[in-house]
A protein has these predicted regions:
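Catalytic center-proximal scaffold of phosphoryl-transfer enzymes
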Residues: 1-300
Length: 300
């Protein structure tokens, strides 16, 4: 399906419909349908299966807003929090490096972390997570995510996205050896190998040895590695066949925010922004036709 850039909408309306004025009509219709979608909750469901392994991926992406700023540190952005759920049975291996999720449930909204909890819980139950044999949550290091998970899904397996580990190892090593040092890549590779062998404590010990040399390591060591050590048992996760990266929600988040909400001059208030986010979620989870079929049944 062709998805044209946002700024080309008036020209496309002029070409196909004979007038750019139809763009505003289409906008009103789209936002009206988005209100119906938001009010009716998730539309996509996952096929029920026995002994299912259920994944939840959570992330946040910053979007420019028109909201009043609350101080000099406020850059005029709101966080679009997104939750993606899928079954391990619905992941197809396209290539060695790429997988495709065949069925998924996706919800996103600009809101505070406290009010995203009920949305997260609704997605989990609607998708059938409470029937699964195992529930795995994949996310980055954001504290609001893990606090929400511990409140709502106490027995879920919590996994810190391995790609973030790599990023922080690179940052740590640059502090130790300096930018461009030939020691950086081999050192990072060695720590990755240890983590994939469940030797988290050994990595922490190695980082602690360099604190006197690079005091700035304290922040990375404490706020990332020490606080998330229990979510870094990658050897165990791989043995059990778990995914250890949250690339699906990263990709969805970029499509939700970057393509339609971060263009030149695009600034929204949160209420307006949440409506197109709802439409984008339905489009990306491929439940668009399901929604319209349900509307046709209601109209019959």
């Amino acid at each position: 399906m062709l998805t044209p850039p946002y700024h080309q909408a008036p020209q496309i309306c002029q070409t196909l419909l004979g007038s750019e004025r139809h763009a505003m009509t289409l906008r009103r219709v789209a936002l009206c349908e988005a209100e119906h979608l938001a009010a009716s909750g998730p539309h996509q469901t996952l096929p029920p299966r026995e002994h299912d392994r259920f994944y939840l991926e959570v992330d946040g992406h910053m979007c420019p807003t028109r909201e009043p700023k609350h101080g000099p540190e406020d850059q005029g952005y709101g966080e679009a929090k997104a939750g993606l759920t899928f079954s391990g049975h619905d992941v197809a291996e396209v290539s060695k490096e790429r997988h495709e999720i065949l069925h998924k449930v996706l919800q996103a909204q600009i809101t505070e972390s406290e009010t995203f909890g009920p949305i997260f819980d609704e997605v989990y139950h609607h998708a059938g997570g409470d029937r699964a044999a195992e529930v795995i949550v994949l996310a980055d290091e954001a504290g609001w995510i893990w606090g929400m998970v511990e409140d709502l899904l106490l027995y879920a397996v919590q996994i810190l996205d391995f790609s973030y580990i790599k990023q922080y190892l690179w940052e740590a090593d640059k502090l130790i050896y300096g930018e461009g040092s030939a020691f950086v890549a081999p050192w990072v590779k060695g720590q990755e190998t240890l983590l994939l062998e469940d030797k988290v404590e050994q990595v922490l010990t190695r980082l602690e040895r360099f604190l006197d040399l690079a005091p700035a390591l304290t922040t990375i060591l404490h706020y990332f590695f020490q606080q998330n050590a229990s979510r870094m048992r990658y050897g165990t996760y791989c043995q059990r066949g778990y995914f250890i990266g949250s690339g699906a929600i990263e990709s969805a988040g970029k499509q939700l925010s970057a393509a339609r909400l971060k263009g030149p001059g695009m600034r929204w208030n949160s209420a307006e922004l949440n409506l197109p986010l709802t439409l984008h979620c339905v489009f990306l989870e491929q439940s668009w036709q399901t929604y319209w079929d349900s509307q046709a049944l209601l109209a019959a």
